[in-house]
């Protein structure tokens, strides 16, 4: 996390509140790339000490004090690493239409679950190949960002939504909703 090459705050640099906020975002993102699904930049704050000398401020990043007053359950949730249990693909999702059970099809393999109505939007292997979120892997915010990018690059897909559901103490199910664009008539 304290990657000296990437950190935004260095000794001798100008005191800038925007840069301090960007550093909080960078650290929180680094935590989420390492499996800490619930870690948020709002958990971090700074102490700034200007008594050191003329035009000098010592800045220290720390965790917010309100964390001390939170339940142990909350603290464990925030500082626990999460793994992906299953990746669910919901294909051709249409919020305006709830299909009957007879219309829905489901298949699964190796921790991936596919649910669709009618003709399948894409083959399972195409979906899996383009999905950097993998069952058994640690949660990684960067994998989620790459998944959005990859799915938006596939021709038939116009809508992508990725969400997570906590299913046990340290496991998340990933839900990926993919929809094709509406056909336009002329």
Predicted feature residues:
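Periplasmic polypeptide-binding modules associated with outer-membrane biogenesis and secretion
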Residues: 1-186
């Amino acid at each position: 996390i304290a990657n000296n090459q990437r950190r935004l705050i260095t000794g001798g640099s100008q005191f800038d509140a925007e840069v301090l906020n960007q550093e909080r975002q960078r650290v929180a993102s680094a935590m989420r790339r390492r499996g800490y699904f619930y870690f948020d930049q709002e958990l971090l704050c700074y102490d700034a000490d200007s008594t050191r000398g003329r035009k000098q401020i010592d800045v220290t990043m720390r965790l917010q004090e309100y964390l001390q007053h939170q339940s142990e359950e909350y603290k464990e949730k925030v500082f626990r690493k999460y793994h992906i249990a299953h990746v669910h693909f919901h294909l051709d999702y249409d919020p305006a239409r709830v299909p009957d059970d007879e219309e829905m099809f489901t298949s699964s393999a190796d921790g991936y679950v596919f649910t669709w109505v009618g003709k399948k939007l894409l083959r399972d292997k195409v979906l899996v190949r383009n999905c950097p979120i993998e069952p058994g892997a640690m949660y990684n915010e960067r994998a989620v960002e790459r998944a959005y990018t990859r799915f938006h690059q596939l021709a038939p897909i116009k809508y992508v939504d990725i969400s997570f559901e906590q299913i046990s103490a340290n496991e998340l199910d990933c839900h990926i909703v993919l929809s094709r664009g509406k056909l336009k008539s002329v």
